[in-house]
Amino acid sequence: MKFLQTSLIAAALPAALVSGRFVIENEGDNVQLDEPAKYLIELSPGETQWVTEEDKWDLRRNGQNFMDITDTQELGTLRAWTQSQASVAFPDKCVKQKEVGELAGHLTKDGMRRNLEKLTSFHTRYYKSDYGRQSSEWVLERINGIIKDAGAEDTVTAEHFGHSWPQSSVIARIPGKTNTTVIIGAHQDSINLWLPSILGAPGADDDGSGTVTIMEVFHTLLKAKDVVGGSAPNTVEFHWYSAEEGGLLGSQAIFQSYEKEGRDVKAMLQQDMTGFVQGTEDAGKPESVGVITDFVHPGLTAFIKKVIEEYCSIPWVETKCGYACSDHASASKAGYPSAFVIESAFENSDQHIHGTDDLIKYLSFDHMLEHAKMTLGLVYELAYHDFSSKAVEEPSEL
């Protein structure tokens, strides 16, 4: 997740440390030993520029969202085919109250807390670090443990989606009767924007909270024997993306692959930052969840509002976060309907992120439970929804 943050830390850090460049003194002149690598980023649809890694972190520290498209320039090029997916018919109302209500009773705050305590115990989950590799290994191990405990090994799978950097993404798949797919996502990486390779980044809220929220939903959904047994019409996937903080790198790689394969993805929901309510309370506003309304699919977003009204005990508020603010943007660029729900109105969200102070102590597990209820309701409703009916929707704002 990307936010506008200002800090005096930058002024206190030597430029060589922030940039990672090394120089030598030669008769008063600084001589740079190596030309830094360049990356192609997209700041808004069609607006691109080449930057160094130092430039990337400078942009992030100044609140600028972007997609690093250096290795994913083909993402979205097949949208002439996938644009037909924009005309997806979402339900008019929720119809699985009995089943979702029974399952929701199995969602626990304790489970999310235990998983988040483990996830934040890694010094950082920076995608280029060995800690990031280790944390992604733990995520896959935990998901496989959930599958085994549910006795679902014969039908449900989990695997790494490898990248050119150490940290892998993780994909869990619950097959349905068709390959029509509903995806729930979160990003597992964290970052310290000042010295990513050195300083700690516990990433409790960004996005440890989303990671363990959808992990808890996955755990609970496997208690539905009909879903595990393949009775649902649609396939369900849970994604834990690597390298969101580097410019949506992991999710872009996955959705570029899905686009090339012609995968039939009808809906993708991103859960990025689900635990901070203090900002809302300090603003004198009622606790709520923030439904993102820009650069998302309007039909899916409208149905998510209905899901929140049906299954959550707190209301929704509309809010905006800009272009490429989280991994749902990768799905949208591939032509797949996507949406994003965050912990609050954007202006009241967590400001402790991207440093050493993104800690569990600032989070509300009661609030995370509301996100879990919403996610469970959405995924169960859509797992059983007949997407074969036709409807004309407004296209995503891309």
From Swiss-Prot:
Binds 2 Zn(2+) ions per subunit. Disulfide bonds join 321-325. Induction: Expressed in presence of glucose, chitin or fungal cell walls. However, lower levels of expression were found on chitin. Also expressed in carbon starvation conditions. Zn(2+) 2 binds at residues 206, 245, 354. Zn(2+) 1 binds at residues 187, 206, 272. Residues 21-87 form a propeptide. The keyword Transcription regulation does not apply. GO terms for cellular component: extracellular region. This is Leucine aminopeptidase 1.
